[in-house]
Amino acid sequence: MIAEIVTIGDEILIGQVVDTNSAYISKELNKIGVSVHQITSIEDDRTHILQTLKEASQRADIIIITGGLGPTKDDITKKCLCEFFDDKLVRNKKVLKHIEELFDKYIDTPISDLNRDQALLPSKAIALHNEYGTAAGMWFDNGGKVYISMPGVPYEMRGLMEREIIPRLMQNYSRPVILHKTVVTYGLGESAIAEKIESWEDNLPKEIKLAYLPNLGRVRLRLSARGDNEDHLRNLIDSQITALHEYIGDIIFGYEDEDPVEVVIGKMLAERNWSLSTAESFTGGRLASKFTKAPGSSASFKGSLVCYFTEAKKELLNVSEELIKKHSVVSAEVAKAMAQGARDKFHTEFAIATTGNAGPSKGDSDADLGTVFIGIATPDGVTAHQFNFGNHREKVVGKSVNKAMELLQQSVIKFTKND
């Protein structure tokens, strides 16, 4: 089945709001074998909405619409759907009851007629229960096509996808099996990897497609398989990844579709009752955030210090003023001192530290823009690694976080082998 997503809202087109909904919807549809072939963002304009719905219906089996279901005059999606389906709005008693209950339980202001009017739905629509908001989702079967309308609020849309839309699609429509496995690599660019795996890629089975996805110092290789037999496709992908290891096994970092690297590191640490801390300068807590977002991180991650200011490095991490004066704040020596300071402060087996010059100015150091030092403290001692990640601040920060994770994983693996 082919799907098309239509997002409605001026706020998306002027860049005020980033469209994260389409990425989520596409990912969830792909999991159940529905392919998204096009995503279109349009303004809150009647003519534009009607024309887009007409065009989408000629390309797709499922048309998913988000946005324009609020209570104000600029929310015109329901009126446009009525015009498109030659329908009229009628009050849905079940939806109205839900709206009144939400106001009674959670909203301090009195319910207004505008709020009650959100229970007006096209008569041909099947109402989809929105547990988290007042705008009901809508499902239309028309001319062999499915049209689905949802609010643009991300958590409301996700609730409808999980509880209403995905279950209905799975129950009512047969779909092919689509499987993905994404190999995460480091240390080589995509062109260098392509050269190393050329013969492997040329001999991939016809059911498998390969995509190169470079991002912030890593290259992801996504293998996608499509067919009718899930076990066959899964075995096919696994066998190809086994073969891939013969070509680039030394730079394979992990698998994106399984546990992310921060979870893998956390599990390795927790299994041995080891712990981790971080000390960060220009990365501003991004490294610690990777770990705290991971489920179960409290079993191994003790804490972090963000020491952006030079004085903070001295006061909180015991980095000596003499060391800073001699080597500068962006140096291997300071990176090592920061890592050791974090290890001592939090009493952890492992600690990792970042110091660098992400730009746009040089700050407290004469180091070139993009210069980064990553320090790692382990039970065996402290090491530091130097890199230069260019002159784009966000790119420098992102690459530094990724590289720090790689170095940490390598250090932990080394100790697990000796354990």
UniProtKB/Swiss-Prot annotation:
Belongs to the CinA family. NCBIfam families: cinA_nterm (TIGR00200), molyb_syn (TIGR00177), PncC_domain (TIGR00199), PRK00549.1 (NF001813). SUPFAM superfamilies: CinA-like, Molybdenum cofactor biosynthesis proteins. Pfam families: CinA (PF02464), CinA_KH (PF18146), MoCF_biosynth (PF00994). It comes from the Bacteria. SMART domains: MoCF_biosynth. HAMAP family: CinA_B. This is CinA-like protein.
